Amino acid sequence: MESCSVAQAGVLTSPFMWRWTGMAGALSALDNTIEDDADDQLPCGEGRPGWVRGELLGSQGVCKDSKDLFVPTSSSLYGCFCVGLVSGMAISVLLLASDFRKLDFSRPEPCFEKEASLWFVAQH
């Protein structure tokens, strides 16, 4: 059974201010990274998806028209997930801290991708 617990909890719970990177398309295609127009440093709001939604959608160009933002409780520090409009088409967008690789997050936990995929299917 896969665990969605957060390792390195002492590091992750610090109030980091992260710049967000948007990854559009398939959730597994993390090498296809697009830098969104995110000039603001956005806090990754652990356990506060409503607050994250307001901050994130106000600053993220690719998700500015999104009505929903999915933040799994177990993985909220790894990133968020939303549906955004790109060239007029609604696509899934995975949002991660731009320095997530430096923080030794090679990719989001598998449970994050699974939960996000199920959420996306339920919304459409």
UniProtKB/Swiss-Prot annotation:
Example of a GO cellular component annotation carried by this entry: membrane
Q: Spell out where the chain crosses the membrane.
A: 77-97
Cellular compartments annotated: Membrane
Q: How is the protein disposed in the membrane?
A: Single-pass membrane protein
- UniProt KW 4Fe-4S keyword: no
Tissue specificity of this protein: Expressed in gastrointestinal and immune tissue, as well as prostate, testis and ovary. Expressed in lamina propria and eosinophils but not in epithelial cells. Expression is greater in benign adjacent tissues than in colon tumors.
User: What is this protein called in UniProt?
Assistant: Colorectal cancer-associated protein 1
User: What are the alphabetically sorted keywords of the record?
Assistant: Membrane, Transmembrane, Transmembrane helix
This protein's major location comes to membrane
